[in-house]
Amino acid sequence: MGTGFHGTTILSIRKDDKVVMIGDGQVTMGNAVVVKSTAQKVKRLSNGKIISGFAGSTADAFTLFERLESKLEAHPGQLLRACVELAKDWRTDKFLRRLEAMMIVADARGTLILNGAGDVIEPEDSVAAIGSGGNYALAAAKALIVHASDLDAFQIAEAAMKIAAKICVFTNENFTVEVIDCASKECS
């Protein structure tokens, strides 16, 4: 992966009336140096109604957050449409095409994965994960959903991320968590 900044794990779980997005805090330069262990890679957008997490270059991710915010302002309450419009720009714009990042975005109604190839993917099983530890977190979360059904969305997300952090050297346990509670006014 060269000497650029990389490495992260973002996981989103949708269970019962909650959507949980969790991300680790590690920023790594190259394959050998941790330059920050408390980065915030999960944030709220659109006046708190949408949660998003990114993997990849931090500067690129902030550019994408800004672009997504403008698409959400142009298409209020339409997460899918805003994401499709962002994906179109991402794929066709000379500058954006060079951005190296992936995002998971979620609102009360759905969860989407966006990537630089212009894909907008709705994950199966209400679980999505990206980043270097994404496959580990995804597998752990799916196993916990099936075999530990008494756990809530937050408990599943936290346990799955702890497993990913033990396996992926680019993921740590300094988690940032955002939750959408669909049983509250937050989803109105």
Curated annotation (Swiss-Prot):
SUPFAM superfamilies: N-terminal nucleophile aminohydrolases (Ntn hydrolases) (SSF56235)
Family annotation (InterPro entries): ATP-dep_Prtase_HsIV_su (IPR022281), Ntn_hydrolases_N (IPR029055), Proteasome_sua/b (IPR001353), Proteasome_suB-type (IPR023333)
Compartments in which it is found: Cytoplasm
Binding of Na(+), residues: A165, C168, T171
Record-annotated disulphide pairs: none
Gene Ontology CC annotations of this record: HslUV protease complex; proteasome core complex
Origin: domain of life: Bacteria
Enzyme Commission number(s) from the entry: 3.4.25.2
One MF annotation (Gene Ontology) recorded for this entry: threonine-type endopeptidase activity
Reaction(s) catalysed by this chain's protein: ATP-dependent cleavage of peptide bonds with broad specificity
Record's keyword annotation contains Cytoplasm: yes
Entry keyword set: Allosteric enzyme, Cytoplasm, Hydrolase, Metal-binding, Protease, Sodium, Stress response, Threonine protease
Pfam families for the chain: Proteasome
Chief site of localization: cytoplasm
PROSITE patterns reported for this sequence: PROTEASOME_BETA_2
Residues of the signal peptide: none
Catalytic site positions: T8
Database matches in HAMAP family: HslV
Quaternary structure note: A double ring-shaped homohexamer of HslV is capped on each side by a ring-shaped HslU homohexamer. The assembly of the HslU/HslV complex is dependent on binding of ATP.
Entry's family note: Belongs to the peptidase T1B family. HslV subfamily.
Protein function: Protease subunit of a proteasome-like degradation complex believed to be a general protein degrading machinery.
Name of protein: ATP-dependent protease subunit HslV
Lineage: Bacteria, Pseudomonadati, Pseudomonadota, Alphaproteobacteria, Rickettsiales
